[in-house]
Amino acid sequence: MTETSTLGPVRSTSRRDPNRAHPTSTYTSLLASIREEGLLQRSRVFYMSLLATLVLALGGCIAGFILLGDSWFQLLIAAALGIVFTQFAFLGHEASHRQVFESGKANDRLGRILASGVAGLSYSWWMTKHTRHHGNPNQIGRDPDIDPDTVSFYDADAAATRGWRAAIVRRQGYLFFPLLTFEGVNLHVHSIGHIFGRGKVDRRWLEITLVVARLAVVVAAVFLVLPLGMAFAFLGVQLAVFGFYMGAAFAPNHIGMPVIPAGTKLDFLRKQVLTSRNIIGGTWATVVFGGLNHQVEHHLFPSMARPHLARARAMVREHCRIEGIDYTEQTVGRSYINVIQYMNRVGLHARDPFNCPALGNLRRV
């Protein structure tokens, strides 16, 4: 059934019978059914094939970069690199969730190589941040993904903004996607700050070596081969595409879904399902979003390999229907519209930095 709300049409379900089993036990039964279907088994052949494909794609970009030389067509190579680096980051994300190998060490090894050595991001920073997010998605004070930043993800934070940030937050819905072009730089800056910071960093020197080497090699190659202006344009396009793709892939997952107040306790099943949004689109969506289109299933079963998510979706939807838990899935276009609408609505709570309090009082007289 389709229901219309301020967040747009979502798929909802009938209400749960109060006589049914507690959600904790129903999640346990769902997990048992998923395991019985073999959906928690690793898919090494799939991931090795995907890795080989991405390595070939990266090799093609490098070959094109060398062959084109001093040409503005290099910007197409830059855009392609942004896409390929994002796909490597998706694969690193899956390795961090133990989706590739049975061994945790093997997954960490692959994830660190892909995230730090190929994408140029700190694997330990990502693991720390992402683990907290999965434990408490969209919960104020516990999910770092909705902590105060350039934009605001909930009303109270927007209302507390001041100065230039308030000016951005007031228009953040319309500015959201343009701002994503800077997300690549933001991710690299956070990664460098983490590995060189005072906090605990797992395998610090290895990550420093991988991240610094990756960034240095790309920058050096670009400035050695291309003229100065073209080199800056190349890096600008690569970083913009990388940031936009990463941000646009993760944005529909939770933005516009219910935000859980600080201190509120929910059972695992509801906490994960009610705050997550799936993207309808079949195989193409799974490829483009790196499996993130099955966000509900990913949060319920973080170690589930990408090829099994679609089959799990049918089981989870039916389970939520029986239990009366809202299960949200939308087209990619509708999800982005909802993201913009939600961000604009939150932004209305931001203070106008040019507003005169005295004039405001006169207006109310």
Where are these regions (language model features)?
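Short intracellular "coupling" helices and adjacent cytoplasmic loop segments at the cytosolic face
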Residues: 12-22, 42-44, 118-123, 142
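Membrane-embedded catalytic scaffold of the fatty acid hydroxylase/desaturase
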Residues: 80-200, 263-354
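C-terminal regulatory/interaction regions
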Residues: 354-365
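C-terminal, non-catalytic macromolecule-binding modules
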Residues: 247-272
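Short, charged cytosolic
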Residues: 5, 9-33, 175-187
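Low-complexity, highly charged intrinsically disordered N-terminal segments
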Residues: 16-53, 57-60
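Alpha-helical bilayer-embedded segments of polytopic membrane proteins, i.e.
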Residues: 42-88, 115-120, 173-185, 200-250
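C-terminal, active-site-flanking charged/polar segments
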Residues: 238-251, 255-256, 317-321, 326
